[in-house]
Design a protein with these regions (language model features):
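Alpha-helical propensity feature that highlights long, continuous alpha-helices across diverse contexts
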Residues: 1-234
């Protein structure tokens, strides 16, 4: 019997060539998008809310294809609405997807109404106002792909979009908003589907990147032989 001793290395200890081999070996057996189920769930909810059917779509780390979008239960006049008429139609029918009710309490002090919060609202004659705010709460399925998919709707109707990094809504630049004014209802719905697959493609691209692989190696304590052969990774 022979006893063989093998030195194991962490990813950061490998040579550049060994790192490339490790990354390529991992990619060769990990083809599925980790968040593919979430993408499909968001797409299903988009189809339900908009009354559409999306078929023959695809995406990977290199690109995406929205496939064929069938507008079930729509008529040509609705799809052709443009400008302010399109904005009004989308707001009335789908605005609830991106804007949430928000309550403001006001009290009357010395004959004037002023904003109040908390217990103060109980001290004086009060009235309540409601408005709507884009809070980025992922209203379709609870994952970030919802916000990406609905951003075109929020942009067209309200001139806002959700900044995932800042975790807040931001105003869309005026030049971008004006370009949107020429779009039709059909354009906006198609943009929502396109935005979903664009986000999925970018997420898939990051998943396959060397940066993400290095993070996974560190988080999971993966080890390698000197030439980059993976020893204990899933």
């Amino acid at each position: 019997m022979k006893e063989v001793t093998v030195r194991l290395y962490e990813y950061d200890e490998l040579s550049d060539e060994a790192k490339r081999k490790a990354h390529e070996d991992w990619l060769s057996v990990n083809h599925e998008h980790f968040c593919g189920g979430e993408v499909r769930a968001t797409l299903k909810r988009l189809e339900e809310e908009f009354g559409i059917e999306v078929t023959c779509w695809s995406y990977d780390s290199y690109g995406y294809d929205c496939g064929t979008i069938r507008f079930e239960n729509w008529n040509d006049d609705q799809l052709a609405l443009a400008g302010e008429r399109a904005r009004a139609f989308l707001w009335n029918n789908f605005g609830h997807l991106v804007m949430r009710p928000r309550t403001h309490y006001y009290t009357k002090v010395d004959g004037k109404w002023r904003n109040c919060v908390g217990q103060e609202s109980r001290k004086y004659e009060s009235k309540v106002f409601f408005d709507r705010t884009y809070d980025g709460t992922c209203p379709l399925t609870g994952v970030c792909f919802d916000n990406d998919a609905l951003d075109p709707l929020a942009c067209f109707c309200f001139g806002v979009k959700w900044d995932e990094k800042a975790k807040k809504r931001v105003m869309v630049p005026h030049d971008e908003r004006w370009r949107w004014k020429s779009k039709t209802v059909e354009d906006v719905v198609r943009e929502c589907v396109d935005a979903l697959f664009e986000s999925a493609q970018k997420d898939c691209e990051y998943q396959d990147s060397e940066e993400h692989f290095a993070e996974m190696c560190s988080d999971n304590d993966w080890t390698f032989e000197e030439d980059g052969t993976i020893r204990n990774a899933a």
